[in-house]
Amino acid sequence: MKLIEIFRSLQGEGPAMGRPALFIRLSGCNLNCEGCDTDLKPSLDLSVLELLKRIEGQGKRVIITGGEPTLQMNELVDLICRLYSRGMEIHIESNGTNTIPLDILEKIHCAVVSPKKGSDF
């Protein structure tokens, strides 16, 4: 997976707002929003298994964000399934432009969809 960063912080959106979480920020976006605060260039390129090793023992709440996570759909589905099988509380933040399969959405505790008006949208 192409990642920008992995970091711990407090969740700022949704029902887990104010709670500690581990953030996995994926690179790439299909919009070009004016004022975007995310550097979309990847700094890490890890397999799903390598990513899981890096985050092991860092808490039970994981926020998958971006960029736009659904641009790496195959790896995203694999990651969500593996996190789910480990009993993780999974949150995802998306711009809502791509569909996540229903069977995968059912494994996610919270999906925050934040539509944006990019120049290519």
List the predicted regions and their residue ranges.
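Anionic group-transfer/hydrolysis microenvironments
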Residues: 7, 27, 39, 67-70, ...
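Conserved, mostly hydrophobic/aromatic
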Residues: 24, 33, 68, 92, ...
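Conserved AdoMet/S-adenosylmethionine-binding subsite of the radical SAM
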Residues: 52, 71-121
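Canonical Radical SAM [4Fe-4S] cluster-binding loop centered on the CxxxCxxC motif
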Residues: 1-50, 54
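Glycine/small-residue-rich loop that forms an oxyanion/phosphate-binding "nest" at active or ligand-binding sites
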Residues: 39, 43-66, 70-74, 90
